[in-house]
């Protein structure tokens, strides 16, 4: 492990690989307890999470639903609920995967909020500030979608006395692969410190369908590139990112991309700059 790998792994609190199934089960239990502690210490009763159809929200949703079920069993308080929210931008190209994820999670409540009208309304109001190139306009619109999804989740959480769950994990955090104040905003992040293959392993431990566990990850924020794979945006694979974070050797080009991207996206992982 090179010094910079160790430094980055420590800053992101990267967890070691699961040694065996027992270690995986212990980590699942620890993260469920974390979710329960966050909620009970807040005095609130619900958890809210947007379900996209990807493995990250699937895994976070499975942890949240089990946490709520155990809290109800332990306390007898039926007010503890997990609310799963679908947040499509009009029609989502992989809606069948999103619905399959919600079905497998079996949340206490499920709702759908179409963010399309709100995003388009805002875009029309600020059109004078947009760039001249379609690609840059599409990129900005993608970030607006992510932020509108979080606005919706916090609105629901506020109305139901709840907390919002985030899906950030170490393999995305190191690349700054999230929208500031969009999917990067949340009250608790139960996947924090995990690499991508650990997120998948946890989903498998719940018996999740392999089609969802191994689905090609995509943020799906850009209209001009629907379903664009995360790895195409990264320039490296998640396997390489995972290996880097666990101190394993990776090809030099991948090493340089990860380190340089980590440095460039530093501002996304810290509190606002202040004098």
From Swiss-Prot:
* Pfam family, any one: NAD_synthase
**Residues that bind Mg(2+):** 56, 172
If you read the UniProt record, what top EC class would you report for this enzyme, in one word? ligase
Q: Name one GO cellular component term.
A: cytoplasm
Which of this chain's residues are annotated to bind deamido-NAD(+)?
Answer: 147, 180, 187, 267-268
Any stretches that span the bilayer, and where are they?
Answer: none
The residues that hold ATP are 50-57, 167, 196, 218
Keywords from the UniProt entry: ATP-binding, Ligase, Magnesium, Metal-binding, NAD, Nucleotide-binding
Q: Tell me the route in metabolism or biology where this protein functions.
A: Cofactor biosynthesis; NAD(+) biosynthesis; NAD(+) from deamido-NAD(+) (ammonia route): step 1/1
Which Enzyme Commission number(s) are listed? 6.3.1.5
Recorded catalytic activity of this chain's protein: deamido-NAD(+) + NH4(+) + ATP = AMP + diphosphate + NAD(+) + H(+)
Q: Which Gene Ontology terms cover its molecular function?
A: ATP binding; glutaminase activity; metal ion binding; NAD+ synthase (glutamine-hydrolyzing) activity; NAD+ synthase activity
Instruction: State whether it acts alone or in a complex, and with which partners, per the record.
Output: Homodimer.
Q: Which HAMAP family match?
A: NadE_ammonia_dep
Please state which protein family the record places this protein in: Belongs to the NAD synthetase family.
Q: What is this protein called?
A: NH(3)-dependent NAD(+) synthetase
Lineage runs: Bacteria, Pseudomonadati, Pseudomonadota, Gammaproteobacteria, Pseudomonadales
């Amino acid at each position: 492990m090179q010094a910079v790998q160790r430094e980055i792994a420590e800053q992101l609190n990267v967890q070691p690989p699961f040694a065996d199934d027992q270690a995986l089960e212990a980590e699942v239990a620890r993260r469920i307890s974390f979710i329960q502690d966050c909620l009970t210490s807040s005095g609130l009763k619900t958890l809210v999470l947007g379900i996209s159809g990807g493995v990250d929200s699937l895994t976070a949703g499975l942890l949240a639903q089990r946490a709520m079920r155990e809290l109800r069993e332990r306390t007898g308080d039926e007010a503890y609920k997990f609310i799963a929210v679908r947040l499509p931008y009009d029609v989502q190209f992989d809606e069948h995967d999103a619905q399959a994820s919600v079905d497998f999670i079996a949340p206490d409540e499920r709702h759908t909020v179409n963010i399309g009208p709100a995003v388009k309304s805002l875009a029309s109001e600020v059109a004078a500030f947009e760039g001249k190139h379609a690609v840059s306009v599409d990129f900005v619109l993608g970030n607006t979608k992510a932020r509108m999804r979080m606005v919706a989740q916090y609105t629901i959480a506020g109305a139901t006395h709840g907390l919002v769950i985030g899906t950030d994990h170490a393999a995305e955090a190191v690349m700054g692969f999230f929208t500031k104040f969009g999917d990067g905003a949340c009250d608790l992040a139960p996947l924090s410190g995990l690499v991508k293959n650990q997120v998948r392993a946890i989903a498998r431990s719940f018996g999740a369908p392999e089609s969802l566990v191994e689905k090609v990850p995509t943020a799906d924020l850009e209209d001009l590139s629907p379903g664009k794979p995360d790895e195409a945006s990264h320039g490296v694979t998640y396997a390489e990112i995972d290996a880097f974070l666990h101190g394993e050797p990776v090809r030099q080009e991948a090493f340089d991309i990860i380190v340089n991207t980590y440095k460039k996206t530093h501002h996304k992982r810290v509190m606002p700059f202040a004098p």
